[in-house]
């Protein structure tokens, strides 16, 4: 059973008119979770992509990024919501559909020039991913690529990210669905 068929779709969540792609059904299934991590691991081993560390975006990016870090023998760095990291941080505000939000990373999370694989569960508008990329660059890192389980290309995040010059890899797309 492929990855896409293990993802639950919830209409009108978190608000009317949104079709939410819920990966919890995918990752609660041990075969599904293994399929995600093994697929990403094989992709990055076969590509031979040069990166030093994985940066995961709170919260589901921690689940995927942590397991992938272990599988690839790479370190893991969290990007968190404000007030969750104990040492000095750098912050990045970004726009949501209604309002704004902020994410943070430790000032000393990366060494200048370190190459990063940025990981999250889903790419929709691209706002969170671009904010995380800005944080990585503020602390001296270089984004080698962004990886997602799900890409929703019709929402426009993929286009925004590619226009900024970043590379994207996703395991599955939901186009026009």
Swiss-Prot record:
GO CC field: cytoplasm
Listed InterPro entries: Ade_phspho_trans, PRibTrfase_dom, PRTase-like, UPRTase/APRTase
Source organism phylogeny: Bacteria, Pseudomonadati, Chlorobiota, Chlorobiia, Chlorobiales
Subunit and interaction comment: Homodimer.
Disulphide linkage map: none
Protein family (similarity comment): Belongs to the purine/pyrimidine phosphoribosyltransferase family.
Catalytic activity: AMP + diphosphate = 5-phospho-alpha-D-ribose 1-diphosphate + adenine
GO biological process: adenine salvage; AMP salvage; purine ribonucleoside salvage
Listed GO MF terms: adenine binding; adenine phosphoribosyltransferase activity; AMP binding
Pathway: Purine metabolism; AMP biosynthesis via salvage pathway; AMP from adenine: step 1/1
Protein function: Catalyzes a salvage reaction resulting in the formation of AMP, that is energically less costly than de novo synthesis.
The EC number(s) this enzyme carries: 2.4.2.7
Superkingdom assignment: Bacteria
KW Secreted (keyword) present: no
Keywords: Cytoplasm, Glycosyltransferase, Purine salvage, Transferase
Subcellular location: Cytoplasm
UniProt name for this protein: Adenine phosphoribosyltransferase
């Amino acid at each position: 059973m492929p990855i896409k068929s293990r993802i639950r779709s919830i209409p009108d969540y978190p608000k009317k008119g949104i079709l939410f792609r819920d990966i919890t059904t995918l990752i609660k299934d041990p075969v599904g979770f293994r399929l995600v991590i093994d697929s990403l691991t094989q992709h990055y081993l076969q590509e031979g992509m040069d990166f030093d560390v994985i940066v995961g975006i709170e919260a589901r990016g921690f689940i995927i990024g942590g397991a992938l870090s272990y599988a690839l023998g790479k370190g893991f760095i969290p990007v968190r919501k404000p007030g969750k990291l104990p040492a000095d941080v750098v912050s990045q505000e970004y726009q949501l559909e209604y309002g704004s939000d902020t994410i943070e990373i430790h000032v000393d999370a990366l060494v200048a020039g370190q190459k990063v694989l940025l990981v999250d569960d889903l790419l929709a508008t691209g706002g969170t991913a671009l904010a995380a990329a800005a944080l990585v660059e503020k602390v001296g890192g270089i984004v080698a690529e962004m990886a997602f389980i799900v890409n929703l290309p019709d929402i426009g995040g993929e286009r925004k990210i590619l226009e900024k010059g970043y590379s994207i890899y996703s395991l599955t797309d939901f186009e026009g669905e």
